[in-house]
Amino acid sequence: MGYTNQPKFLNLCIEIETELNPQSLLKCCLTTEQQLHRKREIRWGPRTLDIDILLFGDQIIEQDNLSVPHPRMKERSFVLIPLNDIATKQIEPISNKSIGQLVVPDNSVKKYKE
């Protein structure tokens, strides 16, 4: 899946409360990426960080620059495993299944330990 010739990286999920609408939140995410010197040179290639909006409550959003739920979220254990840690009962609105129901074990995904 994607570009594999790159260093190991961390994936994490956070849950936030915001009064921003989805487009404003996306703009905030992209601005943060730019401020931290994100370069988009290779699709799915190495990066300093990548901020995605996985879910926005129970909304389904299809716009030119934003799809929520994230369209490849359900295929990616490296997304679902950390998301399950914080939102196991959260419903993914397209499948109408909880994150806990969608996540499958994947030995290639390792939890970070200090």
PLM-predicted stretches and their roles:
Residues 1-10, 18-114:
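Flexible, gly/pro- and Lys/Arg-enriched active-site loops
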